[in-house]
UniProtKB/Swiss-Prot annotation:
Official protein name in the record: BBSome complex member BBS4
Biological process, per Gene Ontology: centrosome cycle
Repeat positions for TPR: 64-97, 98-131, 133-165, 166-198, 200-232, 234-266, 267-300, 302-334, 336-368, 370-402
Gene Ontology molecular function terms on file: protein-macromolecule adaptor activity
Xref: InterPro entries: TPR-like_helical_dom_sf (IPR011990), TPR_rpt (IPR019734)
GO cellular component term of the entry, any: centrosome
SMART domains per record: TPR
Biased composition (Low complexity): 492-506
Quaternary structure note: Part of BBSome complex.
Length: 516
């Protein structure tokens, strides 16, 4: 029995030896790739670079993954040119990899070499024709090259390959640049189906509906954006602007107070706060806020415009002239600027230049009856009844055109027009959509004798108030550069400033159009 036991033991030990196997050796080129990846995803870049250095020394510098990760780290450190050279090395080590070419093109894009980036992306597309990121980045490059047709073509192809919100957002912004607001709304709505909690999309759609005058839908989308992100800066400004446009200044100020805690250095925010105080007739507080906005954004003509408007209301005409002239030097295409400048020049007794400013305003805006009304008042007070009659007839034509769109007019403007028509004895045919509270005033004015025709029409204060309500006949408030409210702007524009959103290393950033 003892001998049998002795024979069994060696057999068991032999089995144990056969089960113990040596760990297989990894190829020397990829031995430390797992450790490099581990340090990189943990953002332990110093340790990662140390391991990369050891790996490159051991492999004579031909380890593709080590070079690739080192290039990514250099890009994160802002060394774009050095990262480009390393990515080119990766492309030489593995010329069949589309990922290496995508990173080369990405570095060229970040260096501003968009044409070269397009060439490399096209080469990568030949290696991988079903990569939506290549099509998307080609669309972004063409966007920077101002080739909008090719940009839309590539972005549409990217959406066909893979439905995602990034390409849809960029495509919608291109449609906004082309003025296709309805198409942009449709594109953003489709993108929202892919990403229903995207606050940027919700805010953008809210602003577009606000621009089209669909306040109910605008409020719905903006409310959803604030539900997902209560500190959403653009959403807060847009919601506050809607309340501000309807005269709810206290509620709007409460909204702006929330935004001020997160973005205290926002020029549009302080501009809106200033115009809330202006609506509450707290002119000193309005000027204080507007000057802070001007300090934060000294080349924003809208802030200068609003400062001129407030100074006109305070009868500080020289200061108003100063700010309005500065605004015109920055922006030449706004009729309201020239109209307010003409008012300031009128009070400064510079009649000839005031007439020139009114003529310029009338040539820039063929739809605003307020320009012709104030110009007619000036000519009437200067004794030019024939010229005043011509401007009044132009006023009648514009009012008739606006009446078809059910536009509501400012009561003060209606009252002034009726007084002017009574003085010129031509105002009986003018029908307003919104009458004044005292219709008898018009009858009394119409019954004046001929001897009263040349009496000065409108005091300085009345004319100043007419200017301060320059957009009173339009319910839509102006939105600009971050939803800045402008008292004259009748058509709000979508604030879309250039940003650098956090994207993957192989995806070029989307481009946002800067607003008017």
């Amino acid at each position: 029995m003892a001998e049998e036991q002795q024979e069994v033991v060696p057999q068991e030990s032999g089995l144990r030896k056969s089960r113990v196997q040596k760990v297989p050796e990894l190829p020397i080129l990829e031995r430390r790739n797992w450790l490099i990846h581990l340090h990189y995803v943990r953002k332990d870049y110093e340790s990662c670079k140390a391991v990369i250095k050891e790996q490159l020394q051991a492999t004579q510098g031909v380890c593709e993954y080590a070079v690739y990760v080192q290039a990514l780290i250099l890009r994160l450190e802002g060394k774009i040119q050095e990262s480009l050279e390393l990515f080119q090395t990766c492309a030489v080590l593995n010329p069949t990899s589309s990922d290496n070419l995508k990173q080369v093109a990405r570095s060229l894009f970040l260096l501003g070499k968009h044409k070269a980036a397009v060439e490399v992306y096209n080469e990568a597309a030949r290696l991988n024709q079903k990569d939506w990121e290549i099509c998307h980045n080609l669309g972004v490059c063409y966007l920077f090259l101002k080739d909008l047709s090719k940009s839309k073509e590539q972005l549409t192809l990217a959406l066909q390959l893979h439905r995602q919100d990034l390409s849809a957002i960029t495509l919608g912004k291109i449609q906004l640049q082309e003025g296709d607001i309805d198409g942009a709304i449709q594109t953003f709505t489709q993108a929202l189906q892919l990403s229903p909690e995207n606050t940027e999309l919700l805010t953008t759609l809210g602003l577009l509906y606000l621009q089209n005058g669909l306040f109910q839908k605008a409020f719905e989308y903006l409310g959803n954006a604030l539900t997902y992100d209560p500190s959403n800066y653009k959403g807060i400004l847009a919601a506050g602007c809607m309340m501000q446009s309807h005269g709810d200044y206290d509620v709007a100020l409460s909204k702006y107070r929330v935004a001020a805690s997160s973005v205290p250095e926002s020029s549009p925010l302080w501009n809106n706060i200033g115009m809330c105080f202006y609506g509450k007739k707290k002119y000193v507080a309005a000027i204080s806020c507007l000057k802070r906005a001007l300090y934060l954004s000294p080349f924003d003509w809208r802030v200068l415009y609003n400062l001129g408007l407030v100074h006109l209301s305070m009868q500080q005409y020289a200061s108003a002239f100063h700010f309005l002239s500065a605004a015109i030097s920055l922006h030449h295409g706004n009729a309201g600027l020239y109209m307010l400048l003409a008012v300031a020049l009128t009070y400064l007794d510079d009649i000839e230049n005031a007439k020139s400013s009114y003529q310029q305003a009338a040539s820039l805006d063929q739809t605003d009856p307020l320009v012709n009304l104030n110009f007619a008042v000036l000519l009437y007070n200067q004794g030019d009844k024939k010229g005043a009659l011509g401007q009044y007839q132009e006023l009648e034509r514009k009012v008739s055109a606006l009446r078809e769109t059910s536009t509501e007019f400012d009561p003060e403007m209606v009252d002034m027009a009726q007084k002017l028509g009574a003085a010129l004895q031509v105002g009986e045919s003018l029908v307003w959509t919104r009458q004044t509270k005292d219709p008898k005033g018009k009858q009394r004015g119409a019954g004046k004798g001929p001897g009263a025709e040349q009496a000065p029409l409108g005091s300085n204060q009345a004319l100043g108030r007419a200017m301060s309500s320059a957009a009173g006949y339009s319910k839509a408030s102006g939105l600009s550069s971050g939803i800045t409210i402008s008292t004259v702007s009748k058509h709000p524009s979508l604030p879309l400033e250039p940003e650098d959103p956090s994207l993957t290393s192989s995806t070029a950033p989307d481009y946002r159009r800067g607003h008017s």
